[in-house]
């Protein structure tokens, strides 16, 4: 089946663009949604290009002045969307320039197309949307053109690298039966600090409401207690030592098969809004926006508002939108009123800032019970703040009448040690349930049970295959995760499969049959904020008697240790790569990771 419908070409004024173009259309099916036409360049793939403000889109470079044009057949109800950003040289000369941007529609070969958008402006950086109703030309063969030219007091000006046009998309009204995907993830969020999971404090009324409308997984874990490895596993359905991102700052391979890439290939709009992990590569997203407010609370608010703005644009096509909030990540400094909402009475000098917690640990100072309770209250305030933001997104989904057609998946990259192990307030490189357990809630009206709960073991590597299955799309054989809901329903019997985890490709863990086993074959002592984080060669915990994992009973159960060691060895041989090539981390990313406590000397 050919996806090439018609040739296209570029018409240039005073410049030559080395690209042709093509209309590419996917076949329609009940789960595919409306046919989308993407106007792709033929000479090489479009690039993921930024606007200088941390938002990236799949885009085409064009000189100034220039006109890009494509012959297309306009579908009924056709709607054009593209975005324009000016390159840095034009922005630098903005005060002396006046630019004109036009979108035109006309008969193929016509010299003067009808102008449907005509804007005059100074060059600026942030992407600006260009939307046009093409329905007046329904079922007609037309030529769509995108033009830009700039002039100063000296006349017309030229630049070889002038603007970026996001790959234009023409959509038509949504068909019934299409499943959108809204993925909400929160950094450093413990499942057991959500009231939906039985926490006595009412930290999460909005997340609780989502659980009442959906299915809650009580035994969900991350494959690694670090953000970049965990979220890469979520999107690739591979364990960290299989995809290669074994530590923060390591980049996802460009050829990785990702959830976003697979949905984008089936003409989903794909966008991501990130408070954390902003500098990581995320193949498959047509739009990638990193918040830049400068504070965790500000970044979260900015990312949330941008995500809601994007939802308002997603009325006519299937979408995959990912929002990742940093909220509960140390330091624990939620805005009012959440900053003090759960702090118990009684003074404590501990403020919950990351650098302060690091200094306390470096000094070997033990905190009092009051100090720990105070810090936990600050952490819970962060949970309350993030819950408020999640509520705003869910409210927008309902107000836009998208709730009934959208699969909502809520989870976290990892949890947080709250002084349970090694006198530690952080997560990486913890191998314990405090940092490995994550919330997992899925809601899809009419498909998933409302108010349901399950003890079915689940890992972040299972999310991509489960999401694809619920949208009716095939699951790649390369995925290592499982479809948690085959046919949209829980398996008749609870799956007792083990949940595996690792840290830095050197320490391994498994949760199986009510036990947690940690295997450190190299006697490796990982570093952590404030000092070393010692982990014994073998650790075994009976979760039924010791849910907080405080007593290592490996010496009392040698046969259990032997069996679980064999389980981990088989998993490593089957699913993990023996050698992960080291990767260089650029200075900007390194500094950002250091500020978050991910890099420590």
Protein language model regions, located:
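Bacterial N-terminal signal peptides
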Residues: 7-18
């Amino acid at each position: 089946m050919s996806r090439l419908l018609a040739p296209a070409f570029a018409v240039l004024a005073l410049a030559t663009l080395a690209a042709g173009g093509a209309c590419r259309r996917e076949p329609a099916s009940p789960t595919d949604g409306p046919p989308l036409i993407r106007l792709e360049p033929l000479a090489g793939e479009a690039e993921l290009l930024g606007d200088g403000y941390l938002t990236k889109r799949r885009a085409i470079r064009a000189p100034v002045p220039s006109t890009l044009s494509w012959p297309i057949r306009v579908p009924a109800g056709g709607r054009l969307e593209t975005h324009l950003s000016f390159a840095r040289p034009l922005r630098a000369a903005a005060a002396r320039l006046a630019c004109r941007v036009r979108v035109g529609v006309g008969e193929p070969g016509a010299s003067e197309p009808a102008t449907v958008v005509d804007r005059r402006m100074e060059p600026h950086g942030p992407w600006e949307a260009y939307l046009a109703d093409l329905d007046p030309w329904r079922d007609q063969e037309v030529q769509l053109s995108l033009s830009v030219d700039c002039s100063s007091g000296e006349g017309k000006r030229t630049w070889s690298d002038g603007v970026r046009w996001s790959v234009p998309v023409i959509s038509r009204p949504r068909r019934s039966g299409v499943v959108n995907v809204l993925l909400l993830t929160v950094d450093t969020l413990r499942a057991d600090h959500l009231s939906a999971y039985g926490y006595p404090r009412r930290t999460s009324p909005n997340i609780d409401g989502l659980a009442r409308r959906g299915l809650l997984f009580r035994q969900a874990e991350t494959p690694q207690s670090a953000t970049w490895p965990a979220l890469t596993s979520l999107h690739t359905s591979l364990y960290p030592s299989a995809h290669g991102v074994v530590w923060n700052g390591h980049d996802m391979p460009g050829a990785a098969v990702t959830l976003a890439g697979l949905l984008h290939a089936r003409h989903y709009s794909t966008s991501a809004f990130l408070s954390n992990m902003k500098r990581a590569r995320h193949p498959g997203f047509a739009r990638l926006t990193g918040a830049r407010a400068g504070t965790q609370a500000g970044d979260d608010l900015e990312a949330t508002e941008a995500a809601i703005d994007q939802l308002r644009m997603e009325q006519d096509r299937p979408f995959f939108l990912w929002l990742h909030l940093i909220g509960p990540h140390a330091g624990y400094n939620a805005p009012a009123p959440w900053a003090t909402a759960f702090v118990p009475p009684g003074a404590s000098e501990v403020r919950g800032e990351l650098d302060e917690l690091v200094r306390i640990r470096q000094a070997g100072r033990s905190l009092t019970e009051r100090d720990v309770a105070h810090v936990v209250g600050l952490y819970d305030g962060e949970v309350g703040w993030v819950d408020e933001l999640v509520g705003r997104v869910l409210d927008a989904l309902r107000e836009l009448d998208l709730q009934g057609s959208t699969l909502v998946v809520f989870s976290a990259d990892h949890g947080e040690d709250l002084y349970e192990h090694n006198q530690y307030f952080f997560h990486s490189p913890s191998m314990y349930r405090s940092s490995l357990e994550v919330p997992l809630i899925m809601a899809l009206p009419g498909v998933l049970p409302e108010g349901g709960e399950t003890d079915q073991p689940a890992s972040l590597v299972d999310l991509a295959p489960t999401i694809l299955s619920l949208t009716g799309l095939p699951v790649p054989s390369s995925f290592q995760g499982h479809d948690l809901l085959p046919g949209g329903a829980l398996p008749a019997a609870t799956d007792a499969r083990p949940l595996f985890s690792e840290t830095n490709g050197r320490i391994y863990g498994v949760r199986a049959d009510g036990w947690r086993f940690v295997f450190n074959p190299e006697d490796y002592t990982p570093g952590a904020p404030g000092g070393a984080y010692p982990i014994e060669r073998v650790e075994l915990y009976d979760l039924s008697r010791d849910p907080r994992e405080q007593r290592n009973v490996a010496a009392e159960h040698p046969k259990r240790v032997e069996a679980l060691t064999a389980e981990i060895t088989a998993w490593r041989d089957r699913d993990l790569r023996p050698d992960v090539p080291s990767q260089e981390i650029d200075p900007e990313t390194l500094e950002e990771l250091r500020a978050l406590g991910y890099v420590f000397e």
